[in-house]
Curated annotation (Swiss-Prot):
This is Aminomethyltransferase. Its EC number is 2.1.2.10. GO terms for cellular component: cytosol; glycine cleavage complex. PANTHER family: AMINOMETHYLTRANSFERASE, AMINOMETHYLTRANSFERASE, MITOCHONDRIAL. SUPFAM superfamilies: Aminomethyltransferase beta-barrel domain (SSF101790), Folate-binding domain (SSF103025). It comes from Pseudomonas syringae pv. tomato (strain ATCC BAA-871 / DC3000). The gene is gcvT.
């Protein structure tokens, strides 16, 4: 038996198929993964993401410490509520984790991956040194993600007028405190929506309200196909300690300036950049019948081989898509080995669908 979120019994009552995910018992789907996927793209749905880890960074030197810890620069965050995406690297520029960082009224809030929480916290504590910084793991909080083009409108109808106004005014990649709730306009689906951190007992009530109002519960299966269509990395598959952000479509999240900011992993990244990154993360589209899966070999004629990191059937596109790490010189065509046969694939930018629009 794995760890359970505060909503475990509600998932069972809704008929969820439960699976292990990073040591947590989580809902894979509530009947049809494909229908749940379409529901989020076309309207909205609610995910239980209480397995994610929330860590508050407090103290006089929180900003200075995070500027050393992270590849992106929290100095960009000038107004409480603003957020950014960053990798946390080791000295060899391997990705320990990726996360969202919010500037709050009294410090910073980090939202890190479920399976890496203990590892992340141990690494952070090992890097504290003499910094005047306190780390507070907010394990008492639950987290719901309401995602889809109608998410904010639907939620605004179910909360107080003051909270509804806050939701309407939130900008993308912004999160604000509202009493015991922290409401952010972020997500992992490629659609607009909210991620709400709130006390566990309130999460149960609110989840029931959402479902009672006709907002469909969505499982991890659809969450995975939604994020894959959006070209969003999954830790442990597309990124990890074995690979740098330069080979993971994450170069945009590295703050190279100011040059004197000596973040962990910078020296290794600069060496890699100077020598030239050997691999890149791309999107693949299979035009024939078949399914692209992680670890399938990608062959690029006269250049070399790579590997699929994530792959699945795309419900939106009605064809198989994948993220793959391939040689840097790869152009627009490659082949993938599926059950001993080679199939041609198109090589595209690693984003297939966002905000309901096809990008390939």
């Amino acid at each position: 038996m794995g760890q359970r979120t505060p909503l475990f019994d509600l998932h069972l009552a809704l008929g969820a198929k439960m699976v292990d995910f990073g040591g947590w018992d989580m809902p894979l789907h509530y009947g049809s993964q494909v229908e749940e996927h379409h529901q989020v793209r076309r309207d909205c749905g609610v995910f239980d993401v209480s397995h994610m880890n929330v860590i508050d960074v407090l103290g006089r030197e929180a900003k200075a410490w995070l500027r050393r810890l992270l590849a992106n620069d929290v100095d960009k965050l000038k107004t409480p509520g603003r957020a950014l995406y960053s990798a946390m690297l080791d000295e060899q520029a391997g990705v320990i984790d990726d996360m969202i960082v919010y500037l709050t009224a009294d410090g910073y809030r980090l939202v890190v991956n479920a399976a890496t929480g203990a590892k992340d916290l141990a690494w952070m504590q090992s890097q504290l040194g003499d910094f005047d910084v306190q780390l507070l793991a907010r394990s008492e909080m639950a987290m719901l993600a309401i995602q889809g083009p109608q998410a904010r409108n639907r939620i605004a109808q179910l909360v107080s007028s003051a909270r509804a106004e806050l939701i309407r005014q939130l900008k993308p990649f912004e999160g604000l405190d509202d009493g015991d709730w922290f409401i952010a306009r972020t997500g992992y689906t490629g659609e607009d929506g909210l991620e709400i951190m709130l006390p566990a007992d309130e999460a149960q009530r609110f989840f029931n309200e959402l479902v009672g109002a006709g907002i469909s519960p969505i499982g991890l299966g659809a969450r995975d196909t939604l994020r894959l269509e959006a070209g969003m990395n999954l830790y442990g598959q597309d990124i990890g300690e074995h690979v740098s952000p330069l080979a993971s479509n994450m170069a945009w999240s590295i703050a190279w300036e100011p040059a004197e900011r000596d973040f962990i992993g910078r020296q290794a990244l600069e060496s890699e950049r100077a020598e030239g990154t050997a691999f890149k993360l791309v999107g693949l589209v299979l035009e024939e019948r078949g399914v692209l899966r992680a670890h399938q070999v990608v062959r690029v004629a006269e250049i070399g081989e790579g590997e699929i990191t994530s792959g699945s059937f795309s419900p939106t596109l009605s064809k198989s898509i994948a993220l793959a790490r391939v040689p840097m010189a790869t152009a627009d065509r490659a082949e993938v080995e599926i059950r001993g046969k080679w199939y041609p694939v198109r090589v595209v930018q690693p984003a297939f669908v966002r905000h309901g629009k096809t990008l390939i």
